[in-house]
Amino acid sequence: MAIVKDFLYNNLKHNIEAGKMQYGVALETTSAEVAEVLATTDYDWLFIDAEHGPHNIQTILNVARAIAPYEMTPVVRVGEAAAGTFKQLMDSGIQNIIVPMVESGEEAAQIIRWAKYPAEGKRGMGAGVVRASRFGRIPDYQQRIDDESMIMLQIESLKGMENLDAIASTKGVGAIFLGPADLAVDMGLGPNILHPDVVAKMEYAIKRIREFGVPVGTIAATPEQAKHYADLGVSFFALGADTAFLASAADSTVTSFKAELEK
């Protein structure tokens, strides 16, 4: 049976490398139907949040299958980093993984070892029988996957900021994702990502990471803040979430009808 699509080609990675801004949306629920609805929009990538959402490997795989016919690229943020986590996700065909709360160069190096095949890493070999290689039908899977995958390390604490250089300079890091909400909390400011002190930390981090030639992603509270960070070098954003959209639309609808009917 012929393979009619290059399943390994990583749209998100190549578009970032080509200088095309990439817009992402978070999936906090485990619904494959909601994921497919989001895949019909103009968002470029789906932020499958297995850190704060109740995802497991099966729900992640169901979501990835649901959006596979579309141009949207799946990105999984794991709850915690471990060798087994990387094997399961990557063998299931997930090529873009965000690891939260990375705080040192040593942590960064260990994560990359879990994600890469020897000699660059220690990822176990099971490619011949798993979805990632389309069950052995992509003969050059092992040769290509390390170049096509993108492992993103999330810096979101004061300690992570202190060790930014060591993290960003780690060989094999695909991108750095900055988490201003946790950073703000760590600074004693609550989740206020618009606070001037948080913005100053973010500005420094973005410019410094770009000096290492590493792509930077983050979230933004407003279009104006996103534009400011993009001007500094951010090339991909996570903007909004399925649960927030649903709550906002529900509130707006019932409020408008109540306002008219209860005059």
From Swiss-Prot:
Pfam families: HpcH_HpaI
The keyword Lyase is assigned to this record: yes
GO MF annotations, alphabetized: aldehyde-lyase activity; metal ion binding
Site note Transition state stabilizer, residues: 77
Domain of life of the organism encoding this protein: Bacteria
Reactions catalysed according to its record: D-glyceraldehyde + 3-hydroxypyruvate = 2-dehydro-D-gluconate; D-glyceraldehyde + 3-hydroxypyruvate = 2-dehydro-D-galactonate; 2-dehydro-3-deoxy-D-gluconate = D-glyceraldehyde + pyruvate; D-glyceraldehyde + pyruvate = 2-dehydro-3-deoxy-L-galactonate
Record-annotated site: Increases basicity of active site His: 91
Record-listed E.C. numbers: 4.1.2.-
Keyword presence, Translocase: no
One GO cellular component term: cytoplasm
Cofactors (names): a divalent metal cation
Catalytic center residues: 52 (proton acceptor)
Keywords: Lyase, Metal-binding, Pyruvate
Amino acids binding a divalent metal cation: 156, 182
PANTHER family named among the record's database cross-references: 2-KETO-3-DEOXY-L-RHAMNONATE ALDOLASE (PTHR30502), PHOSPHOENOLPYRUVATE CARBOXYLASE FAMILY PROTEIN (PTHR30502:SF0)
Chain's role: Aldolase which can catalyze in vitro the aldolisation reaction between hydroxypyruvate (HPA) or pyruvate (PA) and D-glyceraldehyde (D-GA). The condensation of hydroxypyruvate and D-glyceraldehyde produces 2-dehydro-D-gluconate as the major product and 2-dehydro-D-galactonate. The condensation of pyruvate and D-glyceraldehyde produces 2-dehydro-3-deoxy-D-gluconate as the major product and 2-dehydro-3-deoxy-L-galactonate.
Family membership: Belongs to the HpcH/HpaI aldolase family.
Protein name per UniProt: Hydroxypyruvate/pyruvate aldolase
Organism: Actinobacillus pleuropneumoniae (Haemophilus pleuropneumoniae)
